[in-house]
Amino acid sequence: MQEELAWETDGLLPLERQLHEAARQNNVGRMQELIGRRVNTRARNHVGRVALHWAAGAGHEQAVRLLLEHEAAVDEEDAVGALTEARLCFGMNALLLSAWFGHLRILQILVNSGAKIHCESKDGLTLLHCAAQKGHVPVLAFIMEDLEDVALDHVDKLGRTAFHRAAEHGQLDALDFLVGSGCDHNVKDKEGNTALHLAAGRGHMAVLQRLVDIGLDLEEQNAEGLTALHSAAGGSHPDCVQLLLRAGSTVNALTQKNLSCLHYAALSGSEDVSRVLIHAGGCANVVDHQGASPLHLAVRHNFPALVRLLINSDSDVNAVDNRQQTPLHLAAEHAWQDIADMLLIAGVDLNLRDKQGKTALAVAVRSNHVSLVDMIIKADRFYRWEKDHPSDPSGKSLSFKQDHRQETQQLRSVLWRLASRYLQPREWKKLAYSWEFTEAHVDAIEQQWTGTRSYQEHGHRMLLIWLHGVATAGENPSKALFEGLVAIGRRDLAGWSTMARSQLTATSASRVQMILVPQPPE
C-alpha cells in the first residue's frame, strides 16, 4: 500500500463520486448537502471502497464522525466479492486504514463506535501489524494498552508477527516498543525467516544492529538453509554484510542447496558484497548442488566486473559444473565477449569438454557466435606459441577481442583485399595450415555461411586471427605474409605482396602489436 489511498471513482454514480471526493478532502459542508439529498453513504467504487475509507485513511475526524452518524458501516472492507481487484485492494476496513496511516484519533473514534478490534486484512494483517509496519508507535501503544485481548505475537498469512513486520520495514522505534512489550524475538515465519533474516535482506542497518544486540542467533537458518548473512548478500547490502561478519556470522555457511553467501552475492551481481566476503575469507571455489561456483553464476548472469574480481581472487577458471561446463562454456553459449576475454586472458583450459563432448570453441560454433569463435582461436594459438617461447618476456597487454579501431583500418583493408580478390576458394585454408592453424580452427571458421562467397569472409577472419598472433609475437607481418604466400605456391602474388608490404611495413612490428592488442580498461 502507498502513503495515501490511490484515488478511484469508477463504478460510482455522479453524486456518489462527489461524496467520496468530499470525504477525501474533509469537505463536511458538501458532504452534508449530498447526504441531505439521500446519497448512499455506503456506495462502493469498483474496488469496494466507501466514503468512510477515504475519510479514515486521510485522518479527517469531522468527515468520519459525519459518516458514522449517517449509517456508514464501520467494519466494511474493500475488495468485497466480485468487486475484488487484488492489484488495488487489500481487504482493509476503516479501522485498519487508520492504524496503517497512523491516525490515532480516528482509530479511537472507530473503536468507540463499535468497530471490531480483532479484524484482519486479506493478507492477515491486524491493527498491530499495520501500525508496526508503518512505525506508528503511539498507535501501537494505544492498541496494547487500551484494547483488550490483543495477541502480541499473532501471525499474518505469511506467518509473520508485528515484530517481523517492524524488522522487515526498518521501523526501529516500533521494534523497540514491541520488544519492550515482551514479544517473541525468535519466532519464525512460514519460510523459516527470523526478524534477522528480514532486516538483513532489506538492508536496514539500525534494526539489524539492534537485533544483533538483542542476541538473535546469527546462524539461524530458514527453510532453505539461508542465514541472515545469505539474506544480506543476496540483497546487495555490503554494510549489513560487514555488520554481521563483525558480529561473528560464518562467512562460508551453506544452504540446503550448498549455496554460499558468495553464491548469493554473485546471483545479485554485487561486486561490493563479494569483495567484503572474499576479504573475510569467503571461499571463491565452493560449488552448489549443480556444481556451479560463484564464477559460474557471475558469468551466466553477465556480470563482467564481478567476473574480474573473482578471477583476481583465485577462482578456478577451469571448474566444471554438473554439465561439465566451464565458465568459458557458459560465456561461449551466451556470447558474452567481455567475460570470455577475461577468461581467455586468465588462461582457461580450452581442451575441456562438456557432457556433450564439446569444447568451448565447439559451443561458440554451434551457437554461431563468430566473434567469439575467433577470440578462442586467437587464444589457443597464443598459448601454443607461448608454450614454445617460455623465455619471451610476457609484458604484453593481452586481448583477444576483435579490433574495430581506426588505427588498424588500413591493415585490415589490406588483408580484406587479399582474401576477397586474390585468394582462391580453398587457398585460405592452405595458408592457415602453413601458419599452424589446427584442423579444429579451420573447421570452426568454415562453419560460418554467408553465401557462395563465404570463403572470402573465412579467409579474412583467418588473416585477422593470424595478424593478432604475429603482432603478439612481435614478428614482421609483411615478411610473414610473403613467406606464407610462397609456401602455398602463390609466388605470383609476390607483386601484390610487395605493394602491400609498404603499407604493412609502414607500421612497425611494435606499433602493430600496440594497435592490434587493445589495452584493458582502467
Swiss-Prot record:
PROSITE patterns: ANK_REP_REGION (PS50297), ANK_REPEAT (PS50088), DEATH_DOMAIN (PS50017). SUPFAM superfamilies: Ankyrin repeat (SSF48403), DEATH domain (SSF47986). Residues 413-501 form the Death domain. Keywords: ANK repeat, Repeat. It holds the Pfam family Ank_2. ANK repeats lie at residues 14-43, 47-76, 90-119, 123-152, 158-187, 191-220, 224-253, 257-286, 290-319, 323-352, 356-385. InterPro entries: Ankyrin_rpt, Ankyrin_rpt-contain_sf, DEATH-like_dom_sf, Death_dom. GO terms for biological process: signal transduction. This is Ankyrin repeat and death domain-containing protein 1A. The lineage of its organism: Eukaryota, Metazoa, Chordata, Craniata, Vertebrata.
